[in-house]
């Protein structure tokens, strides 16, 4: 597990400098990438720059996200429309949906509320799913039967309109520090058992929890107060 205050815990257990074990070992290869935008409005195109650091092998995936991913046909007018995808929030959610087929994906936000918060990301996801966009739907990667009892639990505890319950109905876990511990454990179990493949979270999820996350989308990294 990831322990952010290992020195304090070591001291509390009566240990010394030599009793803290540090290792650079990683059980899996970590690959880094950055979204780079060009153009504006509906003509915006986003490429994925893999290994953006100079000392690593670099390559780009052009057109990783563009207008084609956000177009849909209006059922009333039968005209093709484009969902607004110019915001960083829309692109973060779109990128996470794009890589869902690779495995469990997390979208990280430094805050739970505000313009750069996890709750806003959950609202953006739900908004996107109201339209038939050409992006993977999280529900298609979830165990619907397993979700049903958890959705009932969340709706009973917090109400059907709570953003966490609405997120789970749409195939995503919302996880942050204001959610009671016992509820977080229920949600973490879904991720651990691979019953769901999308989670929107803050640093609370990383503290003391090992989960099978394949891709991590960093939406915001600076905590605002």
Regions found by a protein language model. Name each.
Residues 2-11, 17-124:
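Conserved interdomain linker/interface between the two RecA-like ATPase lobes of SF2 helicase motors
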Residues 13, 220-225:
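Short, intrinsically disordered, charge-balanced linker/junction segments flanking boundaries
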Residues 83-85, 89-201, 213, 222-224:
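Conserved C-terminal RecA-like helicase domain
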